[in-house]
């Protein structure tokens, strides 16, 4: 992440992101227990398509470790698992928006940085950003960062709108009934996550994307309700294949996932997928490796984190997932098309108009969830 982006991010996050000197509800294991004994297992719980399978296979083979993976498609699903204290996993990858309250709930063990020599490759500005919710960078090791945006099938959208000219504010495609009523027939997809979707709606109606004001949240819900009947699906992962296969013409999603959809469509001969980066701004997030409190294979967890921060590994993973890696030297090793793609590394003007998805207090999370469930149920 560039210093310009993080200067913006820090300004947005500082003072409201929840950085705290408070001790988590449950103390983490001490250094000795974090080191763990050598084992032959590693259990990962992560987003789908979030590492090149070849790198995972190579790690397992080179270290004689059996790596198992399970996948989630929303931060809410991950949070429900780790807050039980019985996740059954050694490594998870929550977003900045959720990690802070999970740390304070005592869901994670501290990271032993002495076991991660490649920690020095992490963009220092990213660490400053994460320190706003993880004081001293004790629990989280940045993995990827990216944007929440939208993508279209240009051919299908042009046919539905009767023109190939897009609105000046490209978010009109999903939030303005004038456009959604025309696009509903070819398929619109929203995030299936209030954490991700509400800030986009708040930004669109001119409110603080991280607002905790009840009236603002109600206004955002009302704005989405106006187009609810035109939304075909709510998804935080299925939109990838649906967009690639022509079952959707507009999808809100994670930038990298939308680029994966674009790549899969191109492999099938469809070159009509375009990932948009609205100049009015996008949502910015950071995902980090964290070790659950109940992790058993702790040494292997550290070993895997270190492996992913190797510039060559980080670049290979970044080329596969089409997100920006936390490893600063990796960008120079990435495919040049991706390294110069504004949907992977947004330009300065876009970053200046964007926001970081911040943690919310419990009462706001509860209200957002209530409004979200009502929206999905068309109430």
Question: Where does each model-flagged region fall?
Answer:
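Ligand-binding pocket segment of bilobal, Venus flytrap-like solute-binding proteins
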Residues: 186-201, 205-276
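Short beta-strand->loop
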Residues: 109-120, 172, 269-283, 292-295
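Conserved C-terminal helix/tail region of periplasmic/extracytoplasmic solute-binding proteins
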Residues: 241, 348-379
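Early extracytoplasmic/lumenal segment of secretory-pathway proteins
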Residues: 27-102, 241
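Bacterial signal peptide processing site
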Residues: 17-21
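A structural signal for short loop-to-beta-strand junctions that line the ligand-binding cleft
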Residues: 87-91, 109-114, 118-155
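Mature extracytoplasmic/periplasmic domains
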Residues: 287, 292-352
């Amino acid at each position: 992440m560039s210093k310009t982006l993080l200067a913006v991010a820090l300004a947005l996050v500082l003072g409201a992101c929840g950085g705290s000197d408070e001790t988590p509800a449950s103390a983490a294991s001490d250094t000795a227990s974090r080191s763990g004994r050598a084992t032959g297992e590693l259990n990962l719980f992560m987003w789908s398509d979030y590492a090149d399978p070849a790198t995972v296979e190579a790690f397992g083979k080179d270290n004689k470790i059996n790596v198992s993976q399970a996948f989630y498609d929303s931060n809410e699903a991950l949070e429900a698992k780790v807050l039980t204290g019985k996740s059954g996993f050694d490594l998870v990858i929550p977003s900045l928006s959720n990690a802070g309250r999970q740390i304070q709930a005592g869901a994670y063990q501290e990271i032993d940085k002495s076991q991660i020599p490649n920690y020095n490759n992490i963009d220092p500005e990213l660490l400053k950003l994460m320190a706003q919710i993880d004081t001293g960078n004790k629990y989280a090791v940045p993995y990827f960062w990216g944007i929440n945006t939208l993508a279209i099938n240009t051919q299908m959208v042009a046919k539905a709108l009767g023109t190939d000219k897009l609105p000046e504010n490209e978010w009109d495609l999903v939030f303005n009934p004038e456009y959604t009523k025309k696009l509903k027939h070819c398929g619109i997809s929203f995030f299936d996550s209030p954490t991700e979707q509400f800030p986009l709606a708040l930004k669109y109606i001119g409110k603080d994307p991280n607002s905790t004001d009840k009236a603002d949240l109600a206004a955002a819900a009302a704005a989405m309700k106006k187009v609810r009947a035109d939304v075909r699906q709510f998804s935080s992962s299925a939109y990838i294949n649906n967009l690639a296969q022509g079952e959707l013409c507009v999808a809100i999603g994670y930038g990298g996932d939308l680029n994966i959809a674009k790549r899969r469509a191109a492999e099938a001969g469809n070159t009509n997928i375009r990932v948009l980066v609205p100049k009015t701004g996008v949502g910015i997030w950071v995902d980090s490796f964290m070790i659950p409190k109940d992790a058993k294979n702790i040494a292997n967890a550290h070993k895997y984190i270190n492996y992913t921060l190797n510039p060559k590994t980080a670049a290979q993973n970044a080329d596969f997932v089409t997100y920006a890696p936390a490893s600063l030297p990796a960008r120079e090793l990435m495919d040049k098309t991706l390294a110069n793609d504004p949907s992977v590394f947004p330009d300065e003007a876009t970053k200046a108009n964007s926001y970081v998805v911040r943690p919310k207090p419990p009462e706001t999370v509860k209200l957002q969830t209530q409004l979200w469930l009502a929206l999905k149920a068309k109430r």
